[in-house]
Amino acid sequence: MIELRNLSQRFPGPGGWVEALHNVNLTIPQGEVFGIIGRSGAGKSTLVRTINLLTRPTEGNVVVGGRDLTLLSAGALREARREIGMIFQHFNLLSSRTVFDNVALPLELAGASRADIEAAVLPLLDLVGLSAQKDRYPSQISGGQKQRVGIARALASQPKVLLSDEATSALDPETTRSILDLLKRINRELGLTIVLITHQMEVIKQVCDRVAVLDAGRVVEEGRVIDVFLQPHHEVTRALIGDVIAQELPPALKARVAERLKTGRGHLLRLAFTGSGVDQPILSETIRRYELDFNILHGQIDEIQGQAFGSLAVLAGGEPGKVGQALAFLREQGVVVEELSYVE
C-alpha cells in the first residue's frame, strides 16, 4: 500500500516560493493500477517522484509498504527504492549495451552473479515480448520496443511498485495501446501496484482502476474511473473527459436548440448509463410512462475497464411536473442525469 499524507512541495522561484503540491492525501492499495492525471504544470511528475523520494517533499509523509520513506537513513532508503521500479517518457537506454545487458544493469550494480542475472533477465524479456531481440542494440529496435526494455529493466529488482511517468506520451496510438496492455498484464500476473502519470484521459480509461485529478498541485477529484466518467464534478475533470467523450453539444447545434426553445419550455440533459442500463429500453419506457418528447441530439457508447458506458444528450419536452417525475424515474433506474441548460 502507498499512502501520501499531507504532502506539500515548494520550490524557490524568481518571484518567491512556488507551491508545486499542496496538502495531497492519497491511499493506493496493493495491486491497484492508479492513475494521476492533470494538465501540464499541474504537479503530476513532482507528485510521482515523491513516491520514491527522487523529490523529497517539503512537508508530509510518504509511506510505502508500511515504511515512511521520509524517515529512513540514506542506506535504508536505497534499499527501499529497490522495491519501487520506474519508467519514463524517455527510455534512457545505454546505446552501447544490448537489450539483455540494459535489462541486466540494475542487477549488475547490485552485485548479482552472471547465473542469477540470466535467470532473472531471460524470463523478463519473455514477459515483455523481446526474447528474439535480446542481442540487439537500442538503435536496432523501435520506440515501443525500447519502452518494453525500460519496463523489463524496472522489473529486474522484483519491485512491488512500478511508477510510470508519461511512459506512453512519446508513442503512437497503436504502440501506446500495446504498452498499456502489457502494463495491465504485468499488474494482473505479478500483483504489481502501478502508479501511472499521464495527461491523456484515454490512457486512464484503458488501464486504470482508480484515478486522481490534479490541478495546480491539488487533488480536485478522486474515485473509480467509471464513476469519474459517469459523473465528473470538477471543471478540469470534465475538460479532460471531453477529450475522450464529448460532454457538450457543438456550439452551432446548441445555438439551434436555444432558438427552438425560445417560444417554449425545455430541458437539455446529459444522460449517462453504465452496465446493464446501456442495453435496456429505459428511455422508451420513460417516454411511454410520462408522455414526454425526447429528441436525441448526440450519443455514444464506449467501454471502460470492460464495462459498457453510454452517454446521451437529449432535449426533453413535456409538462413540467411530468418532466420532474421522469427525471426521478431515470435516476431510480441508475441513470446519471445532468441538466446542461434550462431554457424557458
From Swiss-Prot:
Keyword vocabulary terms for this entry: Amino-acid transport, ATP-binding, Cell inner membrane, Cell membrane, Membrane, Nucleotide-binding, Translocase, Transport
EC category: translocase
Residues that, per the record, bind ATP: 38-45
Recorded topology in the membrane: Peripheral membrane protein
Catalytic activity: L-methionine(out) + ATP + H2O = L-methionine(in) + ADP + phosphate + H(+); D-methionine(out) + ATP + H2O = D-methionine(in) + ADP + phosphate + H(+)
Annotated ranges, domain ABC transporter: 2-241
Compartments it resides in: Cell inner membrane
Family matches, as PROSITE patterns: ABC_TRANSPORTER_1, ABC_TRANSPORTER_2, METN
First-listed, main subcellular location of the protein, grouped into a coarse class: membrane
Record EC number: 7.4.2.11
Gene3D superfamilies, per the entry: 3.30.70.260, P-loop containing nucleotide triphosphate hydrolases (3.40.50.300)
Annotated coiled-coil segments of the chain: none
InterPro entries reported in the protein's UniProt record: AAA+_ATPase (IPR003593), ABC_transporter-like_ATP-bd (IPR003439), ABC_transporter-like_CS (IPR017871), ACT-like_dom_sf (IPR045865), MetN_ABC (IPR041701), MetN_ABC_transporter-like (IPR050086), NIL_domain (IPR018449), P-loop_NTPase (IPR027417)
GO cellular component, one term: plasma membrane
Domain of life: Bacteria
UniProt GO molecular function: ABC-type D-methionine transporter activity; ATP binding; ATP hydrolysis activity
The protein's assembly and partners: The complex is composed of two ATP-binding proteins (MetN), two transmembrane proteins (MetI) and a solute-binding protein (MetQ).
Role played: Part of the ABC transporter complex MetNIQ involved in methionine import. Responsible for energy coupling to the transport system.
Family statement: Belongs to the ABC transporter superfamily. Methionine importer (TC 3.A.1.24) family.
Record protein name field: Methionine import ATP-binding protein MetN 1
Phylogenetic placement of the source organism: Bacteria, Pseudomonadati, Pseudomonadota, Betaproteobacteria, Burkholderiales
Gene name, Swiss-Prot/TrEMBL: metN1
